[in-house]
Amino acid sequence: MGGLRPFAPEFYFYIVGTCCAEISHALRQVTGGKAMTNEDATQLKIRPEDDPWYLLATLYGQPREGDRELQARNRKAWNRYVAQWLNEDAKGAVTKTRSLGAEDTVLLNEEEMTSLREAFAKRHHQAGSSADPEIGQAKPSFIDFSDVEFDRLFWAEGFVFPVVTWFARTRFSEGAMFQGAIFCEKSVFSHAVFSGWADFQRATFHEAEFRFTKFKGGVAMFDNAVCSRWADFEGANFSSANFPSVNFTAALFKDVEFGSAEFPRASFGNVSFPGAIFNFTSNFRGATFGEADFKAAIFKRDPNFVNTDLKGPTSFESVMFSSKPPRFFDAKLHQGTVWRNAIWPLPMLSAEAGDFTDAYERLKLEMDGLKKHEDELYFFKLEMQSRRVMYGNLTDISELRVLGRTISLKRIALKWPASGLPIAIYGFLCDYGRSYVRPLVGLLVTAGVGALPFWLSFGWPSKFWQALGFSLANTFGVIGFRKDFIKPEVTEHLLGILKVFAAIQTVTGIVLLFLFGLAIRNRFRMK
């Protein structure tokens, strides 16, 4: 700082200048090495021809869709040029791929390098590029396509990217072809926008970053893609996502919004979908998970987990299944599978209730096998509620038979209890065997309210306690209270209707006592 005096005006100018320089350096790092300008602030994009890496990728011209011969020439030129920066392990990985051969890693000799430089200079001149016309051989820190706006097909099928590669904030107006591409180091597609289809089939990633990337125009295809370290899709948006048979060591899909999501036969070491939204189909059929986290995810349609293998702890905590329960037929669930605070749907129509019943029955059996008793009871409740809708509470009577005669009831609307009504009563009385409070309250109400007619019969108002005792004895008659505490002549002098009432009270008590005992057994896991 030399002779600058603290608190002098020039001191503050020095500090501000130093801070600005540091901030500028940081922004260049974030933006892939380019200085941040006012154009960046307004999101003005770079013309493809002004990016030197694009010129190299299209060394012999921009191929049209279907022009595989020109694309192959460009690919071989790119791969042989960057092969000088590949180590032996990377070269071995490249030669093992199905789409590339050993010729893609053959180093350019001096004559071929000179020819490539001449071709680059010619391409630079024809494109009217503002990029550096010279192409060097020193290994770069990164390959940078950041902020480029591609208004045409970007065709990088089978390209090898030997160093950190940036496509941050890049826009692809047409299709983007990365099929079979190999990213040897970190690849960054954060905040990129794919307005057309995006093809990453059979691509190989080391570290992949697609944070807040938008795939909004077509299908994003990652079929058979491999990621050896981690893939980060936080905040990404997919109109349609295909990840069949991918092999990701670790992946994060935090707050991702999917249109349709296809993950059949996918293999994940650790994967997280916290806060993800699945707007349409979500297919994980045959997928394998190490540890999985779906906390607070929302499934709006039909989640398919058939034949999935959850090898590690899996969290469905606070998940919302909006329209249909997940299907876990032939799935293998880990004992650490958690459903805490999950929101489950119930069928509205009997036509769909069968699918709900089957799904909840499967989950109930899975929880029974894992000895997760509370979850088993809860899925049994959901199964019963679905069965009630399937069977219905009341059914229409179209005709009535009386003394051998059939009476049509087309003009008279009559109902008859259906098979679902007992299930509804079972749920009301004890929450399908989960609540011992409900039958206990029912017993007290039966005894208390049932005492009123006996009170009137025995003598109002002095015989209240006698009437209450008689009502309690009836309610708990199965235990033998009435025989032990009530004289036989008391019952003999009752009116006939009160005798019928006492019998109904005893039957009600038997049912409620049974439900109370069942709930106690279930709640405290008594065998």
Provide a role label for each language-model segment.
Residues 7, 11-14:
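Aromatic (phenylalanine/tyrosine) cluster motif
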Residues 19-20:
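Cysteine-centered motifs
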Residues 23, 36-420:
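N-terminal leader/targeting and pre-domain segments
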Residues 419-436, 454-506, 515:
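Pore-loop/selectivity-filter region of tetrameric P-loop cation channels
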